[in-house]
Design a protein with these regions (language model features):
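ABC-type ATPase nucleotide-binding domains, specifically the catalytic core motifs of the NBD
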Residues: 51, 69, 107, 132-151, ...
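Conserved ABC ATPase signature
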Residues: 170-174, 178
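Short beta-strand immediately N-terminal to the Walker A/P-loop
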Residues: 69-70, 119
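Conserved ABC transporter NBD signature motif
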Residues: 95-103, 115, 148-153
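Helix-to-loop junction immediately C-terminal to a conserved catalytic motif
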Residues: 87
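ABC ATPase C-loop
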Residues: 187-188
Length: 189
């Protein structure tokens, strides 16, 4: 089962907009306006298999700017497989995956990450001997624009003040909640 929950009650952010319905209202005509209509992430008629076992049958998902999507289901119901497809770690047998209206199926995982798609797994997988700063910068390893990386790091530290307070600490010394914040910030880098 897939549940979509719109963000409400959160301050506006460049990452998720302000969550108001007018963010998704039909825009005026024109190329830029038409581009605002399509979902940010789309899976269309995705079919995937593990050997003879079909993991997805015509899976359709749409995620618009300002939405949080939660994949819910029992063991072996395809949640992790869906994320692997979105991240480019697994190619579906058929169907489309679009990010910002462009297919990601021909892209490598680093190219998909550069487009701004990230994931925070249940297991945070930080590098415990590295500092928080070094862990965050690992989220931008595939990017060459140092100024943009520095700007993103600054934004993450503003978004997660507790992470900013711990920027020079080794990640392994942080509490579980602090480590989760670092993992989320790294995914947004």
């Amino acid at each position: 089962m897939i549940a979509t929950v719109a963000r409400t009650g959160l301050p506006p952010s460049p990452l998720w907009g302000d969550g108001r319905d007018e963010d998704h209202a039909a825009p005026a005509a024109g190329p830029a306006a038409r581009a605002a209509v399509h979902p940010l992430l789309q899976l269309r008629k995705v079919n995937s298999f593990y050997g003879p076992v079909q993991a997805h049958f015509d899976l359709d998902i749409e995620v618009r700017k300002g939405q949080i999507v939660s994949l819910l289901g029992g063991n072996a119901s395809g949640k992790s497989t869906t994320m692997k497809i979105v991240l480019g770690l697994l190619k579906p047998r058929s169907g489309e995956v679009l990010f910002d209206g462009v297919s990601t199926l021909g892209l490598s995982t680093p190219q998909i990450i550069r487009k701004g798609i990230g994931s925070v797994p249940e297991a945070r997988r930080l590098f415990p001997a590295m500092t928080v700063r070094e862990n965050l910068l690992m989220g931008a390893y595939a990017r060459n624009d140092r100024r943009a990386v520095a700007d993103d790091l600054e934004r993450m530290l503003e978004l997660f003040p507790r992470v900013a307070e711990r920027i020079d600490f080794q990640a392994g010394t942080l509490s579980g909640g602090e480590q989760q914040m670092v993992a989320m910030a790294r995914a947004l880098m």
